[in-house]
């Protein structure tokens, strides 16, 4: 087995665990509580996730002071978190001087697919883009998301894409 296939297998396993956790919370507690718990877990995890990612990439806190440095870090962080078999359906482009543009291929967001199977996509609060926002919060970087998907954009509009505009000091 290649390192690529093992890494992809393990990362997909983590996403399956995440999905099954949400599914069981949904069935036990209802959609509102499952959404709230999911977002609370994401927010709680983000500081640890960013600290570990920075350590693995040899980046010191406070050193992401330019947009190119931040953009490179965020792309590498996403590459570490998402399995390649899923990441190939997600496209991030950098729009200097301050914008990350994201887009999922139509119907290919892993959360959309899982939540659709669970039968509650019409009431799901997007956790994927929320997680990226929490990463910026954990890094202490001001940003805004346009549009900011509180619900599942793929379900509502047939696509999921938007911009994250950052405001670095200086």
What are these regions (language model features)?
Residues 139:
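Conserved ATPase active-site switch/coordination loops adjacent to the nucleotide-binding site
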Residues 104-108:
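Short loop/turn segments at strand-loop or loop-helix junctions that form parts
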Residues 1-101, 111-126, 131, 142-163, ...:
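N-terminal accessory segment detector
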């Amino acid at each position: 087995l290649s390192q690529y296939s093992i890494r992809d297998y393990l990362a997909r396993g983590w996403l399956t665990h995440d999905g099954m956790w949400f599914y069981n919370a949904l069935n036990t507690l209802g959609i509102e509580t499952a959404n709230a718990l999911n977002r609370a877990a994401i927010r709680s995890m983000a500081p640890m996730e960013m600290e570990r990612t920075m350590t693995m990439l040899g980046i010191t806190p406070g050193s992401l002071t330019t947009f190119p440095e931040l953009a490179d870090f965020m792309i590498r962080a996403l590459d570490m978190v998402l399995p390649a078999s899923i990441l190939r359906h997600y496209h991030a482009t950098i729009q200097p001087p301050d914008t990350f543009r994201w887009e999922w291929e139509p119907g290919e967001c892993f959360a959309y697919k899982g939540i659709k199977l669970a039968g509650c996509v019409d009431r799901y609060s997007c956790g994927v883009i929320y997680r990226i926002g929490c990463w910026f919060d954990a890094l202490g970087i001001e940003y805004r998301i346009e549009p900011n998907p509180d619900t599942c954009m793929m379900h509502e509009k047939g696509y999921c894409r938007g911009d994250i505009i950052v405001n670095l000091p200086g």
